[in-house]
Amino acid sequence: MRSPNEQARRISEGKKDDGNMIFVQSDDRKADEAKSLRDRAETILGNKLASMDIAKLACEKWLDVRAFGQLFALKSNKKAGKKKDDGSDDEGDTGVSIGIRGPVTVQSAFSVETIDITSTQITKSVSGEGDGTKRGSDTMGMKHRVDRGVYVFYGSMNPQLAERTGFTDTDADAIKKVLPKLFENDESSARPAGSMEVLKVIWWKHNCKPGQYSSAKVHQTLRDSLKPDGIYTLSNLSGLVPEEISGF
C-alpha cells in the first residue's frame, strides 16, 4: 500500500517543477531559502500571518494549499498578557490555527494482486581490531523490496470546495499534466530511476457541478475490469467517457 500523503507529495513536487508556488516542499528540493513552513509563510504573507484572511491569501499564493488543503497552526512571536487564577499577570503564547479543506483528495494506492516481498540482509565488512588485515562481517539490518507489482489509486475533485479555495480548471489541468510523470526525478535507493512508472491515467470530467454519477460508481467502472498485469477494459457510464492518458 502507498499512502495518500506520498501521492500528494509527488503531485506537488511535479507542479513545483512546472513553475507553480508550493507551500509544503521537501528539504532536498525546495525552491527557496525557507528553513521551516513558518519561515516560508512569514516570508510570503508577512504581517498578514495573524490575519483572518490568511486562508484566502494562502490559497491565492500556493497551489498545493488550494488543491489539497492545509492546517496553519502557527505560534505568534508576541506574548499576550493572561491572568492567573490568583489575578497576577502571566505571559502566554498566542497564535493562529486555521484549517483549509482542499477539493482534491487522493486515496491510498493498493496492489491489484497480492505481492511478493523479497528480504535481503545488509552486512558491512569492517576491520574490528588489530592491524586491519582481518575483516569481520557485521549485520546492519534488513532491506525489503517488491520485485514487481501493479498499483492503482483513485482521486476526486470537489467543485464546492474548489469554489472556496479558488481551485480552477487550470489548476486541475496542472494536476492532470503531472500525473503521467509521477515518478520522474523522484528516485532514491529504494526506488532507483526507471524502476517505477505510471502506466495509465484515467481522467473523468463531469458536465455538471453535482456530478453525473457518484465517485464510487465511476471508480467501479475501472475496478471491475482491472487485471493483475494492468490490462483493463472500461465499462463506460452513459454520457461519461474518460480521457485515457499514457504514462510518460
Where are these regions (language model features)?
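RNA-binding basic/glycine-rich loop and surface signature characteristic of RAMP-family CRISPR effectors
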Residues: 1-248
